[in-house]
Amino acid sequence: LEGSPKLGGAAYLSALINEVREKEDTVFLFDSGDMFTGMLANLTEGEALMEMMMTMEYDALGIGNHEFDYGIEPFKRGIHRVSFPVLGANIFYKDTDQLFSRAYTILERDGVRLGVIGIIGLDARSVILPSYVEDLDFRDPIPYVRKGVEELKPLVDVIVVLTHQGKTGPMQTDAEHRPEVQRDFDEDIKLAGAVEGIDVIVSGHAHRGIEVPYIHPKTGTLIVQTYGYGTRLGYLKLFFDGEKITRHEGRLLKVWSDKLKPDPLVEKKISYYKDKVDHIIGE
């Protein structure tokens, strides 16, 4: 509606990220998948979004179902060209134990060492066009997260899991009493309870939005998730006493496009790809 506040946009999201970086000493930036969405992604087979992520200096991407919207090969090309790790601990080439991409990575900044694992859930796998991923196996993520945690624990201070799982569904529906159509993060709660040693789960796919970090009652794992579509920036600050997390602060920051000044570098990239797409459409 005219006059209503405006939310979202990559250049405005980047501006908000830069504001956080200016205020905080040590910042890591993650995405839990489905970056390959929207017209620019569709007409460039994800290239435009990968370029913008590099400009915004992401530290890691967990694989989502939309990363396979153009098949395996375009995504593989994207993985090889980006400067950040793309993670999928439970995606294998069919009938082998060869990973499609990296299972995890170790990031170090200002003396803080993070182990970051990425997984995609079987619900998310089910919405990928089968012919596009017929050469891949998507396996139960829990054993592979457990394996990653066991390998990373002696090497890092914090373990983060980027998840793309759970059910998506309309936020309001005539059948909203039915659990299968609700957006929720039950799969993340299940994972947090099944694997000891996960400090943070950065969740995607369901776009449920968790306004304040959920704390697992058994393991203490923090679970965070935005509403997706670049309308919020998830902010989580961890406080340490030695190597132990003692407390945290977390919330969703709204990306007000009528209040933020767009990041000129990202804006320039968007303009370049819009011109490129207009040329493609005009042919």
For the regions a language model picked out, list residue spans one by one:
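Acidic, metal/ion-coordinating pockets
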Residues: 1-265
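Active-site nucleophile-His-acid catalytic modules used for acyl/amide transfer and hydrolysis
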Residues: 266-283
